[in-house]
């Protein structure tokens, strides 16, 4: 009964939170600030958001209830109208369907062009007039909300009152008692994925605006974190290679069907049986025994850290629109991350009581049979799922002991504590690029601190000298050097235990080694600054090679690379490597080129780097007290080794292939990419100046708008990824990735085209765009939009840190005085960029 009534049980959670409340008295969370909503007299609802995430652009949506006749809906659209305004398809086309409603989505409408905004509003009401039922208009972006609301109201007067929508059939939860084991071919070479999905009753609409979805979401994410950590440790201890562990919770705000909780593991095809046994064992253990207090405390801390990070993250227009759509269709609450944090911080529940409720949540959800589906995606066309089902059930039944949990609160005591003499600050100044405070210490080390309101501190420790300085490095090993620093025992802790200790304290840490430098970077809670310094010092002074960790890393990396090659980034990495053949230091990983002696070679490099910490800089950005941070740094800086050695910028041979190359692969060949698609890469050597950089960014947007006209009749969604490279040569590149939209989301006279036709159209489009003229009006609009975007970047902590590191690493400034350089960009500058790309290296990569 507990499993069948899991959400009724969640009402009891809130009874514990608010003594004396009845189920019908669950408090409403209200709506996030910044959203203007209501209903016009004729019954049309509206949700309007002024959001500066994407300067100069806005997303619009129209929701029509009970408008699920796809033929009628598709017939109402004309792609020419939107394409001429620079508005392309979303991944679903212009139309998607959810909860018995049709949803029209128009993204990146250029609001800096009044004609585009006016035309979009007119079109929305043309669509409104074609459907008599209840409807809602959603808009999020660079908008004057008060003015937009007035315009929508005036337009609404031209439309008759809406007919009330009939009540939708009541949702019925249909639990299952027998597990389902499913197999499908995944088109890979050796990578298999095991997915374990538990279904659960959706939250009733009357509770969607209460804290109940927040608590379900919190427990789901805590469960996902615990399962990931347990599986990673168990696979590691059993030396079973693991590409990834992922967890996905599909909540009631994103579907009109059951909620689902899915655990996914990427493993070798040859290890499917053993992986099944291990996964079943972990699930059985957590079902029988729940989680320990220490493990639950760790999961709570990780969830809180994730919430803190998301509170500082900007909200995209797509995210705003999605949450408003879910509110209109499903009654979902629209709560900001900060409001959610406020709710969770107000939950005055003792740890043991909270853990007890969490364990009851686990017991209600996880079961060896009920509401369970296990899916296997493998390279083979057939699989004995009956045998795997028996393996799963046997492992569940025979799990002998609890899974070990290796995060201990006293692990931090093992970290290095600085005993060296305090290092005085020799001078203090202001960094001209970031306006941060520069502290120069007596040993030559420099720290730049920029005070912000972010509770999550961003940090980076950069030391000049990149992978060209690794002794005897072999061709292709450069891409792996940064990973080697994560394979050391630190202060007696294994690599995994050290990572767990950092994660338990909310600290992220990654090492990146480029052609120019080494950089250790990440985030940390503001109250963990001292622990962060001790962790960096521990890597610096007390590390030892762990050869077993490297061997396991190499076996896992082979699987991770196959997973990566099926992604958009993987496709672009392949096309990039085609344009730059025989480059000795590629950034793309090829595990066949990873030598077993790289850890020893990398250690010589790291040892040399850590002897010259003065040849670099530390950047810290966040809500820290400057005086308190100074005390930590004065105590810590003397423990870092410094010397007189300095690195010089390397000279490396680099050849960009000229001309046009075409590669065609069958999607069943299990090579690169997933599904059908057309991909195009363009690159050209071009000297970097700030004016050229601004011209390149305008050119990318102009190309996007022009390509929309060519891709719209072919039913293609596409994205453009611009790339700036400064070393070993100054180069610009763009990567265009096209994928077919579903027919149901396209206008009636459009069907998704074959990838070969898509590439042919792009091939013809380039000369046309290159020969076109950029009008003064268009340039002005594009320049104004970019000015707004760059103004937003100048206040974005992540972008500021990237710009700072780029200046200190490669000597180029992409932040200072941007408006001056942008104002100087001419139409000729923009067209020269496009022309150089058209004359440069071009690669077509077709998956059919």
Place the predicted regions along the sequence by residue.
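Alpha-helical scaffold elements lining the catalytic groove of polysaccharide deacetylases
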Residues: 594-598, 602
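Bacterial N-terminal signal peptides
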Residues: 9-18
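Long, His/Glu/Asp-enriched segments that create or flank divalent metal/ion-associated functional microenvironments
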Residues: 216, 220, 224, 431, ...
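Bacterial N-terminal signal peptides that target proteins for export
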Residues: 1-10
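Proteolytic maturation boundary segments
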Residues: 22-50, 136, 142-209, 213, ...
């Amino acid at each position: 009964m507990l499993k069948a009534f899991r959400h009724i049980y969640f009402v009891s959670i809130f009874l514990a939170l608010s003594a004396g409340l009845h189920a019908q008295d669950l408090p409403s969370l209200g709506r996030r600030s910044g959203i203007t909503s209501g209903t016009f007299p004729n019954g049309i609802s509206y949700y309007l958001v002024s959001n500066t995430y994407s300067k100069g652009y806005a997303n619009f949506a129209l929701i029509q209830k009970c408008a699920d006749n796809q033929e009628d809906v598709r017939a109402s659209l004309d792609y020419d109208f939107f394409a001429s305004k620079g508005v392309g398809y979303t991944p679903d086309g212009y139309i998607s369907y959810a909860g018995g409603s049709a949803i029209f989505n128009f993204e990146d409408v250029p609001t800096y062009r009044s004609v585009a905004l006016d035309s979009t509003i007119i079109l929305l009401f043309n669509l409104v007039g074609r459907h008599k039922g209840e409807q809602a208009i959603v808009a999020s972006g660079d908008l004057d909300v008060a003015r937009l609301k007035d315009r929508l109201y005036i337009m609404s007067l031209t439309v008759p009152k809406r007919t009330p929508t009939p009540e939708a059939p009541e949702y019925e939860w249909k639990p299952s008692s027998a597990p389902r084991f499913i197999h499908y071919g995944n088109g890979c070479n050796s990578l298999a994925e095991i997915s374990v999905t538990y279904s659960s009753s959706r939250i009733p609409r009357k509770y969607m605006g209460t804290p109940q979805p927040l608590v379900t979401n919190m427990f789901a994410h805590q469960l996902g974190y615990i399962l990931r950590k347990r599986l990673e440790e168990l696979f590691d201890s059993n030396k079973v290679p693991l590409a990834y562990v992922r967890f996905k919770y599909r909540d009631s705000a994103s579907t009109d069907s059951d909620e689902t909780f899915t655990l996914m593991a990427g493993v070798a095809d040859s290890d499917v049986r053993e992986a099944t046994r291990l996964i079943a064992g972990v699930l059985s253990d957590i079902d029988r025994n729940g989680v320990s207090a220490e493990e639950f405390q760790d999961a709570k801390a990780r969830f809180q850290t994730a919430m803190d990070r998301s509170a500082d993250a900007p909200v995209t227009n797509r995210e705003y629109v999605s949450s408003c759509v879910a509110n209109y269709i499903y009654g979902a609450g629209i709560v900001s991350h900060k409001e959610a944090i406020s709710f969770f911080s107000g939950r005055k529940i003792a740890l043991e009581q909270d853990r007890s409720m969490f364990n009851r949540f686990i017991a209600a959800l996880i079961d060896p049979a009920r509401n369970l589906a296990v899916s296997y995606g493998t390279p083979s066309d057939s699989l004995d799922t009956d045998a795997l089902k028996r393996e799963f059930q046997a492992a569940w039944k025979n799990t002998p002991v609890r899974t070990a949990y290796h995060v201990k609160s006293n692990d931090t005591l093992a970290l290095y504590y600085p005993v060296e003499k305090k290092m005085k600050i020799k001078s203090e100044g202001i960094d001209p690029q970031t306006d941060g405070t520069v502290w120069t210490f007596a040993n030559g080390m420099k720290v730049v601190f920029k005070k912000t309101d972010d509770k999550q501190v961003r940090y980076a420790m950069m030391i000049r000298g990149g992978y060209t300085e690794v002794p005897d490095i072999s061709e292709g090993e450069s891409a792996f050097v940064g990973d080697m620093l994560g394979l050391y025992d630190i202060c007696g802790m294994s690599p995994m235990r050290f990572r767990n200790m950092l994660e338990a304290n909310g600290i992220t840490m990654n090492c990146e080694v480029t052609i120019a430098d080494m950089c250790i970077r990440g985030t940390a809670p503001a109250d963990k600054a001292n622990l962060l310094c001790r962790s960096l010092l521990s890597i610096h002074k007390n590390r030892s090679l762990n050869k077993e960790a490297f061997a396991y890393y190499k076996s896992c990396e082979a699987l991770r690379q196959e997973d990566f090659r099926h992604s958009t980034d993987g496709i672009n990495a392949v096309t990039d490597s085609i344009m730059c053949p025989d480059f000795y230091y590629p950034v793309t990983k090829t595990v066949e080129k990873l030598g077993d002696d790289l850890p020893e070679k990398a250690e010589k490099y790291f040892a040399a780097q850590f002897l010259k910490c003065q040849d670099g800089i530390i950047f810290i950005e966040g809500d820290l007290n400057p005086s308190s941070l100074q005390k930590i740094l004065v105590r810590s800086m003397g423990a870092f080794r410094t010397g007189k050695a300095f690195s010089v910028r390397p000279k490396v041979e680099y050849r960009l292939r000229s001309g046009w190359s075409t590669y065609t692969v069958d999607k069943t060949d299990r090579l690169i990419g997933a599904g059908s698609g057309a991909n195009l890469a363009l690159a050209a050597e071009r000297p970097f100046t700030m004016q050229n950089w601004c011209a390149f960014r305008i050119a990318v947007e102009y190309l996007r708008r022009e390509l929309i006209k060519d891709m719209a009749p072919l039913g293609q969604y596409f994205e453009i990824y611009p790339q700036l490279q400064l070393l070993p040569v100054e180069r610009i590149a763009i990567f265009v990735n096209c994928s077919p939209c579903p027919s149901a989301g396209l206008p009636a006279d459009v069907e998704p085209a074959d990838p070969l036709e898509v590439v042919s159209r792009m091939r013809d489009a380039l000369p046309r765009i290159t020969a076109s003229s950029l009008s003064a009006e268009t340039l002005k609009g594009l320049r104004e939009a970019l000015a707004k975007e760059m103004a937003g970047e100048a206040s974005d902590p992540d972008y500021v840190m990237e710009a700072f590191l780029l200046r200190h690493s490669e000597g180029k400034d992409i932040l200072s005085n941007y408006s001056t350089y942008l104002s100087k960009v001419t139409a000729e500058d923009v067209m020269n960029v496009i022309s150089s790309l058209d004359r440069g290296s071009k690669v077509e990569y077709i998956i059919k």
